[in-house]
Design a protein with these regions (language model features):
Chain A
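Short, Lys/Arg-rich, polar N-terminal cytosolic tail immediately upstream
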Residues: 1-26
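A structural signal for multi-pass alpha-helical bundles of membrane permease subunits
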Residues: 11, 23, 32-326
Length: 326, 295
């Protein structure tokens, strides 16, 4: 900066250096204004749809169908959340009570409202199992590919790379037939197994990147001290790899939590349906209140949003590492 | 015993360590792909489970003669081109912004992660409600700002539907693209800028002659990666339009879904998904090639 300004002003007549300084000041001011405007625009575009979802979920029926919309609810209500959390009682609407109302008015909380919490539990169980399996198979493999020279090492890395890009929709047809034959349809195990296909390659990849970044000398020192490869991995590398493990856990969890296509194919009843499936079933029913749908949507985005905000640093570094090679 | 003779300790450990991953991926990735290739040579209708004749390339030939398939290809291409172009451009702006040093930068980058984190289904229901023709926020906002004098139909309008779905897609994909572009922005050596400044290159010239060319790999990565995601995207189409109105959003992934799970023709569904997988592999090959060259 210093030399550069010096060079530039040296080339000009003395009288014009003041002019230059003012120009720099205007430029700096403009720079700040552009940054401010840009930041505000980004925040507005990202947050306003979400804010509208939140606002809608607290509106009562009269407000949600008002034209033009009430951006902020006049009389915020918790009735949707009550219906979800206390699925039994007055708030549950059965076929009979529904018939008493005019379905066209849309003032309708579906009888399946009570499925949301079990679906959340299903999503949570599936995601947790997927995370555990990812760590179990991913950590040793990534360590071996990053730190041990063996015949076929490059080949196995390329293999992981290739499996990473298999589109989920290409897996649906064969998976469906296999799972049907195994009798696993409508069982959360079918989701745990198939989600491995879309999470494990990414997991291994991020971990390889991270292990490769750790010095080989650590390994040598551990081996000289009499550690086996396994001990070297668990006692030396794993504690150091914590940040990447956090990233891996988050990605596997969020991917499973958010997954829709495979769950749509393999689940049929509330016994195995995950949150996205129950949510999607609400959106296709025109008689369900919009504010209820938004409330359900709000519940679905709260956990991932909290995770994203709390673990921002790990997520960004993980995505960056995952990006470098594919 | 034989294992011990052929491989030394290192190699045995390595094999032991990678065996679980190879088994898992063999079962959940390699096998299904091979199996769907195999299936694509049979006529499999779940309505007639006992008759599954081997039909050679009939499923593929049938596809190429099917008008719906070509419509789906066209819709997928349109959706992908609109989305990827918008994602790349917007991500470039946001990445340039986040590459500056200013107070509140952390806040902006944290907020930016929100769309990335939420499920596509939630993204879909959020935009479906915004686009709603009766009570939606888009109508409300445009009406209050006097851009329209009566509420309009959005998703139900053939000419708008793909662009509106693309909007919901772009909203969710820009954060990741931004992070990827930011990596390549940060890796531009500052000497380049110094040199350009000493040479008296003005801001815009520095941008076009230093910044953009240095980000080539980043752009490549974003474009190919987002293309791979966009051509197979399913969730938004399922919830927002179900391929409609008419065939306005009838993309390939939707066509695969309809063919497989509504018409119950698993053979031709498998053929189509296999084609989609091949396209994705071709794109991925380019990723590996280009990155392999630059690293």
């Amino acid at each position: 900066m210093q030399t550069d300004r010096h060079l530039q002003s040296a080339g000009r007549a003395p009288g014009r250096s003041i002019n230059y300084r003012r120009r720099a000041e205007i430029f700096r001011w403009l720079h700040r204004a552009v940054i401010l405007a840009g930041s505000l625009a980004v925040m507005l575009v990202v947050l306003s749809p979400v804010a509208w979802l939140v606002s809608s979920s607290f509106q009562n029926e009269a407000e949600i169908v008002s034209v033009p919309p009430h951006w902020i609810p006049d009389q915020p209500t918790l009735k949707n959340f009550k219906a979800i959390f206390a699925a039994t009682g007055d708030e549950t609407v059965t076929y009979e009570t529904r018939n008493k109302q005019d379905p066209a008015s849309g003032d309708y909380i579906p009888s399946t409202a009570g499925n949301l919490l079990p679906a959340m539990a299903n999503s949570f169980i599936v995601a947790t199992l997927v995370v555990i399996l990812n760590l179990l198979v991913g950590i040793p493999a990534a360590y071996a590919m990053a730190k041990i020279r063996f015949y076929g090492r490059n080949g196995s890395i390329y293999f992981i790379l290739t499996t990473r890009v298999i589109p989920d929709i290409a897996l649906v047809v064969p998976f469906f037939l296999v799972i049907k034959n195994l009798g696993l349809l409508d069982h959360i195990l079918s989701l745990v197994i198939t989600y491995l296909a879309i999470t494990v390659p990414f997991t291994v990849f991020i971990l390889i990147q991270y292990f490769e970044g750790l010095p080989d000398e650590l390994d040598k020192a551990a081996r000289v001290d009499g550690c086996s490869r396994f001990q070297s991995l668990t006692r030396v590398f794993l504690p150091l790899a914590m940040p990447s493990l956090v990233a891996v856990i988050l990605f596997a969890f969020l991917t499973s939590w958010n997954e829709f296509l495979l769950a749509l194919m393999f689940t049929q009843t509330a016994a195995s349906q995950t949150l996205p499936i129950v949510l999607a079933s609400f959106t296709s029913d025109f008689t369900i209140s919009f504010s209820f749908i938004n409330a359900a949507g709000l519940l679905a985005i709260v956990p991932p949003v909290i995770v994203a905000i709390v673990f921002e640093r790990y997520i960004v570094s993980g995505l960056t590492a995952g990006a470098v090679k594919g | 015993m034989r294992l011990r003779r052929h491989f030394n300790y290192e190699e045995r450990t390595a094999l032991l360590f990678i065996a679980p991953v190879m088994t898992v991926l063999g079962v959940v990735a390699v096998f299904p792909i091979a199996y769907s290739f195999y299936l694509s040579f049979f006529r499999i209708k779940l309505t007639r489970p006992n008759r599954t004749p081997f039909v050679w390339f009939d499923n593929y030939l049938h596809l190429f003669k099917d008008e719906m398939f070509w419509t789906a290809v066209l819709r997928t291409t349109t959706f992908t081109v609109i989305s990827v172009a918008a994602i790349t451009l917007l991500a470039l702006f946001v990445a340039l912004l986040l590459n500056q040093d200013f107070r509140g930068r952390r806040l902006v980058s944290t907020v930016l992660l929100i769309p990335w984190a939420i499920p596509y289904v939630a993204d879909a229901l959020m935009w479906k409600w915004i686009y709603d023709s009766g009570y939606g926020a888009l109508n409300g906002l445009l009406y209050q700002l006097d851009f329209i004098d009566k509420y309009m139909i959005w998703l139900g309008d053939q000419d708008k539907t793909l662009a509106l779905i693309a909007n919901a897609f772009v909203w969710k994909e820009v954060p990741l693209a931004t992070i990827l572009l930011l990596v390549s922005l940060k890796s531009i050596p500052s000497d380049l800028y110094q040199a350009a400044r000493v040479d008296g290159a003005p801001l815009l010239q520095r941008f076009f002659h230093v910044t953009l060319p240095s980000m080539r790999t980043g752009f490549m990565l974003v474009i190919i990666y987002e293309t791979m995601i966009a051509i197979r995207h399913f969730d938004l189409f399922f919830i927002l339009t179900e391929g409609g109105p008419g065939t306005a959003s009838h993309v390939l992934s939707w066509e695969i879904y309809v063919e497989t799970f509504r018409n119950l023709s698993f053979g031709s569904g498998a053929a189509m998904s296999y084609l989609l997988a091949l396209i994705t592999f071709a794109l991925a090959y380019f990723i590996i090639r280009t990155l392999g060259r630059s690293v």
